[in-house]
Amino acid sequence: MIQEQTMLNVADNSGARRVMCIKVLGGSHRRYAGVGDIIKITIKEAIPRGKVKKGDVLKPVVVRTNKGVRRPDGSVIRFDGNACVLLNNNSEQPIGTRIFGPVTRELRSEKFMKIISLAPEVL
């Protein structure tokens, strides 16, 4: 569950390390975002010479949460941290060329097939 002011790790090689959620998109009073949801973030920590810099405002997709994802069979998949993959603001394609760590099968929609194909493991 991601809400405003939540700090997330970045699971790609775009150059950002830590980001902070500034808005959960999708509805006027929507409070929480889960895996597969698009949020609005600002970059709080970035590496030198990366594709993005500190202070940039972007729209990533959430790929891992501490809260986890409940499957129809009743199982829950939880992770040790909250992570996201940064997307291009207009094309909604990933900025990075590599994805680090596992992602869940819930991302298998037409919009995020590129992330699924780049990920080393799909749970």
Curated annotation (Swiss-Prot):
Highest taxon above the source species: Bacteria
Gene3D superfamilies hit by this protein: Ribosomal protein L14
Assigned keywords, A-Z: Ribonucleoprotein, Ribosomal protein, RNA-binding, rRNA-binding
CDD domains: Ribosomal_uL14
Gene Ontology CC terms, in alphabetical order: cytosolic large ribosomal subunit
Pfam name, any one: Ribosomal_L14
GO molecular function, one term: structural constituent of ribosome
GO biological process: translation
Annotated SMART domains: Ribosomal_L14
Subunit structure as annotated in this protein's UniProt entry: Part of the 50S ribosomal subunit. Forms a cluster with proteins L3 and L19. In the 70S ribosome, L14 and L19 interact and together make contacts with the 16S rRNA in bridges B5 and B8.
Alphabetized NCBIfam families for the sequence: rplN_bact
Stated role: Binds to 23S rRNA. Forms part of two intersubunit bridges in the 70S ribosome.
Family assignment from sequence similarity: Belongs to the universal ribosomal protein uL14 family.
Protein name: Large ribosomal subunit protein uL14
Organism of this sequence: Escherichia coli O6:K15:H31 (strain 536 / UPEC)
